[in-house]
Amino acid sequence: MKKIVVFGSSNVDIVVDVERMPQPGETVRGKTMCKLAGGKGANQACACGKLHGQCSFLSAVGCDDSAQLLLDSLEKANVDARAVLRCEETPTGSAHIQVDASGENSIVVVAGANAFCNRSYFEAQKSILLDADYILTQLETPLEDTYDLIEEMK
């Protein structure tokens, strides 16, 4: 079986359903709110783990409740998350998502620990990366370092 490594973001998605999007300076009431495991990288890793079963995830989270939500989600999806960096100095990344009645959304992303998915982190995980048959990444981690990873792992 081919080994897949996903290098990317981990976010807690905070989703609020609203009747309509607020205008600048306006406050609107939310109907419901939920917290979900998310981030493009974590979502891709979970999909690979569920479909393929041989997936490792390289990312960074804080040492908070959001991190535990993400790590539990990865474990449930059969993703090897042992190399996920735990950052004491910054919280887990978050995405604050408003969804209106028509399904349109507006998203604000706070990088948080995802900022530590950088060159020094992927250099420390080189053995995992070199053992991969496929490496999957996205653009929610520091761009310059992500481009370096792609170039180095060609």
Language-model features, listed with the residues they occupy:
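Ribokinase/PfkB-type carbohydrate-kinase core domain
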Residues: 1-10, 60, 71-86, 97-154
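Short, glycine-/polar-rich solvent-exposed loops and beta-turns at beta-strand/coil boundaries
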Residues: 88-90
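Glycine-rich phosphate/adenosyl-contacting loop at the front of the ribokinase-like
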Residues: 1-60, 65-69, 76-79
